[in-house]
Amino acid sequence: MFAIVHMSDVVRIPPNRLTHSLNDAALQILKEKYESMISPEVGYVIMITDADPSSIGKLVAGDGATYHKVTFKALAFYPKLQEIIEGEVVEITDFGAFVRIGPTDALLHLSQITDDYLKSDVKQGVIVANQTARSLKIGSKIRARITAVSLGKGAGMGKIGITCRQPFLGAVEWVADEIKKA
């Protein structure tokens, strides 16, 4: 789920940035620190949208920088368990597919695609069901449910697991076929 989150921090504005406006300097420093970061509290920080630094800062002896409290807004993506998401298949492997959801990729394991037996062809970039002949290939749009979320700290990649083994989940074409049958 995408959200605008309100955060606060203390930023160190070095002497070479004091020629810029306080707001611009603080915003640039926050972008360098937070954008592309993963936090267990807010999820994937995509971008900093607004910063409001305190005009009163602190000086530390021996350091030419000023320290300012700042409140800011960030656009974040926080994957929630059981959430239904839509994404695009970006990679096919011998154990499943990676699906782009927001700023990251989620793993769709072979056992979580469908109840049918599956054959994965990595060279062709396709997964084919044996009985129904349904296929999942790079570029396919899918609808899935998030079943596992593990967000690390810092810039490390989090891990997200998804499933399509429920009614009205899977490739968009599969869902359209199920709706016609219902």
Model features per residue range: what roles?
Residues 1-182:
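Single-stranded RNA-binding regions, centering on S1/OB-family and related RNA-binding modules
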